[in-house]
Amino acid sequence: MKKAAIIGGTGYGAIELIRLLDSHPYIELAKIISQSQHGELLDETYPHLATYVTQPMQELHIQQLIEEIDIVFLATPAGVAKEIAASFLDSSIQCIDLSGDLRLSSSDYEMWYQKKPASEALLEKTAYGLTEVFQEKIKQANIISNPGCFPTAALLGLIPMLENNIIESKGIMIDGKTGISGAGKNSSAKTHFSTTNENVTPYKIGTHQHIPEIEKYLSQHVEESSVRVTLTTHLIPMTRGLMCTMYAPLQQDIDTADVIDLYKHYYEQSSFIRIRKQGEYPSTKDVTGSNYCDIGAYVDKRTNQLIISSAIDNLVKGAAGQAIQNINVMNGWDEKTGLSFLPVYP
């Protein structure tokens, strides 16, 4: 049994990790660490955890973690995780960072996050944790940068099409929509019920930190040039769920049926990718509470565009679920371990 710690234990991503780890047969959640609420009981903030999490939250002590813990999940804000992860470079700890600290190059991170980047030594030893695509690199790494929620949905939909030269690398447009939990636990005027109810709001147009992340990892799958995308994200009035609908110029003449077959072949060994039949499209309700990514596609001959829809639960496949999937791969366990549950419906 491996012992795990969650650092930053009071955010939505951490709370989802706690829920999912409860059913993992090989991991014991030994420590929940919160610098702002250490000494407090987690079920005082989250009553749904009553009788399950009985230990008080603890302060961060790096050396104690190195001596006692096998797995660390970093659920801290951007700017914090990179400092903690660097402490584990020379240890045997397996570290999964759910923030954006280790996803980008130093220059891109500084530009998009407006913070000092991680060290090059740390970035060089970090693997990007899009499990279905980078599994071999994940197996060899001890530090994993868990993908963002929008990049997870967008990359899983676009990479197979770019790799097979179905779409152009320029002119890709991504329409992203996420539930309110995607904005995090801390409330603001933009996330109040009276603001979000019966309302759809675009945000961070042209400035979203997931733009360079999507471009970086798409560009690794084309030969001639770097990929540029337009991403517009929207906050919608539901608790959880994320949908990316993508529009990409076609590079070759192809039918929808052939596109569907290509997706099925590309992901035939992937436990958590479900490809919709021709004429059927994903919805967020169909993946709620699960680690699935549902993908549907349509070839629009009239406009010479491929339209791709990709749905995930932003807190599971877009965060905690993918983190556990990566830990499973790192340890040689079946990637479905602790994640074999159906979506919540209705």
Swiss-Prot record:
Active site (catalytic residues): C149
EC class name: oxidoreductase
Disulfide bonds: none
A Pfam family per the record: Semialdhyde_dhC_1
Reactions listed under catalytic activity: N-acetyl-L-glutamate 5-semialdehyde + phosphate + NADP(+) = N-acetyl-L-glutamyl 5-phosphate + NADPH + H(+)
One Gene Ontology term of the molecular function aspect: NAD binding
Keyword Cytoplasm (UniProt): yes
UniProt keyword annotations, A-Z: Amino-acid biosynthesis, Arginine biosynthesis, Cytoplasm, NADP, Oxidoreductase
Coiled coil segments of this chain: none
Gene Ontology CC terms: cytoplasm
SUPFAM superfamilies linked: Glyceraldehyde-3-phosphate dehydrogenase-like, C-terminal domain (SSF55347), NAD(P)-binding Rossmann-fold domains (SSF51735)
Cytoplasm keyword on record: yes
PANTHER family: N-ACETYL-GAMMA-GLUTAMYL-PHOSPHATE REDUCTASE, CHLOROPLASTIC-RELATED (PTHR32338:SF10), N-ACETYL-GAMMA-GLUTAMYL-PHOSPHATE REDUCTASE, CHLOROPLASTIC-RELATED-RELATED (PTHR32338)
Family classification: Belongs to the NAGSA dehydrogenase family. Type 1 subfamily.
Record's function text: Catalyzes the NADPH-dependent reduction of N-acetyl-5-glutamyl phosphate to yield N-acetyl-L-glutamate 5-semialdehyde.
Name listed for the protein in its UniProt record: N-acetyl-gamma-glutamyl-phosphate reductase
Naturally occurring in which organism (per UniProt): Oceanobacillus iheyensis (strain DSM 14371 / CIP 107618 / JCM 11309 / KCTC 3954 / HTE831)
Lineage: Bacteria, Bacillati, Bacillota, Bacilli, Bacillales
Gene designation per UniProt: argC
